[in-house]
Amino acid sequence: MSADCLNAHLRKTLARGRVAVSRPAGCERIALYLFDPTVLEGPLSHEEAQAVVAEPAYWSFCWASGQVLASWILDNPGWVEGKRVLDFGSGSGIVAVAAAKAGAREAIACDIDPAALDAASANAALNGVSISLCRDWA
């Protein structure tokens, strides 16, 4: 996966949407492709706002819970080293990436949104780690 693929996903919702490489606050050891706010030159039109609400790109933001957990994993690698780790509802994949960086035997990003799995894959590659992807944990 690449930034181009993620940009294509974003543009399904917001025509001017794109990703940029970011390092989330509190977890600067991980780089992620996230929504680039510089594309917003003003307020969203009514149609754009409706599209964002109808099909939100949750994966294009790094949620605080993921940032905190990823940082904790990197600070405490012994908890995941050599183990199989599941990042359930992975979104950007930050927790799976952190687990892989911390030495997990396998880090699995699981999300029902195919675009989120593309984001997790792209973010793993950006950080030089390998993760597994799972669309449905049944």
Q: What is each PLM-predicted segment?
A:
Residues 1, 34-36, 50-53, 112-118:
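Generic detector of short, locally flexible boundary/turn motifs and exposed helical patches
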Residues 25-80:
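SAM-dependent Rossmann-like transferase core, predominantly class I methyltransferases
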Residues 65, 71-137:
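Conserved SAM/SAH cofactor-binding pocket of Class I
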Residues 9, 45-47, 88:
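Domain-scale activation on soluble regions of proteins
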Residues 1-41:
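N-terminal auxiliary segments of SAM/dcSAM-dependent transferases
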